[in-house]
Amino acid sequence: MLSSTDFTSASWELVVRVDHPNEEQQKDVTLRVSGDLHVGGVMLQLVEQINISQDWSDFALWWEQKHCWLLKTHWTLDKYGVQADAKLLFTPQHKMLRLRLPNLKMVRLRVSFSAVVFKAVSDICKTLNIRRSEELSLLKPCGDYFKKKKKKDKNNKEPITEDILNLESSPTASVSSVSPGLYSKTMTPIYDPINGTPASSTMTWFSDSPLTEQNCSILAFSQPPQSSEALADMYQPRSLVDKAKLNAGWLDSSRSLMEQGIQEDGQLLLRFKYYSFFDLNPKYDAVRINQLYEQARWAILLEEIDCTEEEMLIFAALQYHISKLSLSAETQDFTSESEVDEIEAALSNLEVTLEGGKADSLLEDITDIPKLADNLKLFRPKKLLLKAFKQYWFVFKDTSIAYFKNKELEQGEPLEKLNLRGCEVVPNVNVAERKFGIKLLIPVADGMNEMYLRCDHENQYAQWMAACMLASKGKTMADSSYRPEVLNILSFLRMKNRNSASQVASSPENMDMNPECFVSPRCAKKHKSKQLAARILEAHQNVAQMPLVEAKLRFIQAWQSLPEFGLTYYLVRFKGSKKDDILGVSYNRLIKIDAATGIPVTTWRFTNIKQWNVSWETRQVVIEFDQNVFTAFTCLSADCKIVHEYIGGYIFLSTRSKDQNETLDEDLFHKLTGGQD
C-alpha cells in the first residue's frame, strides 16, 4: 500500500468547474487526484466537496479541450488521458433545447446533451408522440434560413415575441420518466382516425404528461396559414445549389449535441430527414401525419420541390380545406364519447395497417397470375430526335413488361422484354391536356435506360402505373395492395380534373380566404387575387367532402407523386472531374446531376452497392457497385459524413418490417452510418 507521502507525490491537483443550476456563475473546485482514480471516484469527491444536498445523478464530466464526455465512470483518469491541465466541467447531461417543428412551431424541452443524436431524437419523438423517430433528425439552419426575416426585423421598432410551447417537464429529462406523452406501442387506438383528436379513453394520460389537450392540439392540428407578406419574407431556394445549402446542417447521429457544439437553449430544426415513411396509421400518428403534412406544405410553398401550376392549385385547395377543418376540429370537445364502436374501429385499424386487401381475395391472389395487355404508345429518348411516340401492343405480367408490334404477334417473341424490379417510376401527367404518361428509368450496369409510356385515359393509366410501381418494389399485381393503389391514383387524377368539380357553391368575394397564403409567392404574382381564389375554390370542390386526416394523407400522397420527391441535394466534386456537380440522394438511388442544367447524368441504385466508406484523409466518399464499378466524390456544401450517413440511413430503413414492432437495431444503424471501413 502507498503511504500518505507516496500518495501525495503520485497525486496532482485537478480543477473542475461546477455548473450548478441554482447559481448564476460557475465555480471552480480543486481536487487532489491520482491517475489510477476512476471517473466515478472524481465525481464522488466533487459532490462531497460541494456539500450541497440534491440529486446529482444527471451530472457528468465534460472535457472541454477534447470535446467529449467522460461517461465511462469505471475508466481511470490515466485511461482517458486526463492530466492536470485538463479543463473539466461538472454539468447536467440534460439541458433545455429549442426546437422548431415542421409546422414552424417552437417547442422548448429538456434533452440529453450526452446521448448520441439518434437516441436524443428518439426521446424527443416520444415526448412529442411521433412514432418512427428513425425517420427524423436535427438540423442546424443554414445562414440564409433567417436572412430575409432579420432584414425585416430591422425596420420593426417593436420587438417580435414568439409564442413558445414550453415542455420543460418533458419525459426526456430522466430515464425513469413518467407517462411518455401519448406514445404507445399497444394496439389501443389513441387518436380519432377521422379528425385526429385524442381518443377519449386516452385523455387521462395527459395528467402526467407535458402534452396537455392544448399542446396536443398545437402539434396534431395545422396552424393558421401565414400571411402572404410573411411567406414572401421566408428564404426560398432558387437553384439546386441553393437547395444543397439547406441540407448542410444535419447533425451527426453518432455524436452527442455537446460534441457538435450545440449550446444550452440553442435552436435547432426537427425535420423528417429520410423520405421513407413507414406504417403511417391515423389511429396512432395524428402528430406525425400533421408534422409530415406541414413539412410537405412548406416544401411546396417555398419551392424547395418543383411542381406544375395545376399541381400547385391542387395543393392550395387541400391546404384551404385542411385549414377550415382544423379550425372546426379544435373547437370540438375532446372528452366526448366516440361514436365509432370499438370492435369496428379495431377491424378498421387492422384493414389500414394491412394496407388493404380482403380475406376473400386470398385464394384468388394465390391461384391467379394477373396480366395487363393493351395498346400503349412508346418513346425512347435519343439525341437529335424529336419526341415521337409509336404505338405497340404491351403485356405486363409478374414484374416484367414486354411489347410487340401488334396484338396478333403476342404469342411470338416480343420486340423487347424488361424486368422492372428496382426501376424508377415517375408520373408524367397533365390532366388538363389529357396526357397520361409514365416515365421508366430501368437500371443497367452504367446507369439507367430511360423510356416513356403514354396511356389513352385515366383508367388505363391508373392500372399500368400501379403495376409499374409494384413491380419496381418486386411485387406483382397479385399483391393485395394493387387494387388500393389503382384507386389512390384515380382519386388523385380526379382532384386534378377541373371538369369533374361541381358548380362552385360560393363566389370568391364571399370566401374567407387569402389565396396568396396557399400558393408559392412566384405563383401568386402570376394571377390576380380574385382569379387565384376562383381557381382554388374550383379545385376545392373535388376534395370538399374529405375528412381532415384523409385530406392530409392525400396531400402527402400528392407530394410523394412529384418527380423530385425525396431527393436531397449536395454540391460535390467527383474524382477526376474539373467541375462541380450536384449529387441527389433518394431512398433507393444516387443521382449525378449537372449543376448548370439540372439534367441527370448518371443514376446508381442502392441495390447495386457492394460497399461504401469515407476516406478521412482525402475527405472523400468512396462507393463500390456491382461489376467492379467505383465512384468517389468530395462534398463541397457539407461534411462528407452527412452524405455517407444518408446512404447508410436509407439502407437501414429498408430493413424495417412490421414484424419488428417498433424495436430498432441501433447498433446496425451506427454500423451502416458510422463511416468506418
From Swiss-Prot:
GO MF entry, a single one: integrin binding
One GO cellular component, as annotated: cytoskeleton
Compartments where found: Cytoplasm, Cytoskeleton; Cell junction, Focal adhesion; Cell projection, Ruffle membrane
Swiss-Prot/TrEMBL keywords: Cell adhesion, Cell junction, Cell membrane, Cell projection, Cytoplasm, Cytoskeleton, Membrane, Phosphoprotein
Cross-referenced SMART domains: B41, PH
Annotated ranges, domain FERM: 96-653
Occurrences of domain PH (ranges): 337-433
Modified sites of kind Phosphoserine: S170, S179, S361
One of the GO BP terms on file: keratinocyte migration
Membrane protein topology class: Peripheral membrane protein
Principal location class: cytoplasm
Family to which the UniProt record says this protein belongs: Belongs to the kindlin family.
Subunit (UniProt): Interacts with the cytoplasmic domain of integrins ITGB1 and ITGB3.
Free-text comment about domains: The FERM domain is not correctly detected by PROSITE or Pfam techniques because it contains the insertion of a PH domain. The FERM domain contains the subdomains F1, F2 and F3. It is preceded by a F0 domain with a ubiquitin-like fold. The F0 domain is required for integrin activation and for localization at focal adhesions.
Role, per record: Involved in cell adhesion. Contributes to integrin activation. When coexpressed with talin, potentiates activation of ITGA2B. Required for normal keratinocyte proliferation. Required for normal polarization of basal keratinocytes in skin, and for normal cell shape. Required for normal adhesion of keratinocytes to fibronectin and laminin, and for normal keratinocyte migration to wound sites.
Entry protein name: Fermitin family homolog 1
Organism: Pongo abelii (Sumatran orangutan)
Name of the gene: FERMT1
